[in-house]
């Protein structure tokens, strides 16, 4: 998801 790419999550989720 975009949340990971934006840096909201510690892991780089797509």
Swiss-Prot record:
Its main location: secreted. Expressed by the skin glands. Ile-14 amidation is not necessary for insulin release stimulation, since the synthetic non-amidated peptide shows the same activity as the amidated peptide. The modification Isoleucine amide is found at residue 14. GO terms for biological process: innate immune response. Peptide with unknown biological function that may act on skin macrophages to produce a cytokine-mediated stimulation of the adaptive immune system in response to invasion by microorganisms. It does not show antimicrobial and hemolytic activities but stimulates production of the pro-inflammatory cytokines TNF-alpha and IL-1beta by mouse peritoneal macrophages and does not potentiate the stimulation produced by lipopolysaccharide (LPS). The peptide increases IL-12 production in both unstimulated and LPS-stimulated cells, but it does not stimulate IL-6 production in a significant manner. Belongs to the frog skin active peptide (FSAP) family. Frenatin subfamily. This is Frenatin-2D.
């Amino acid at each position: 998801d975009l949340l990971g790419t934006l840096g909201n999550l510690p892991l780089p989720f797509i």
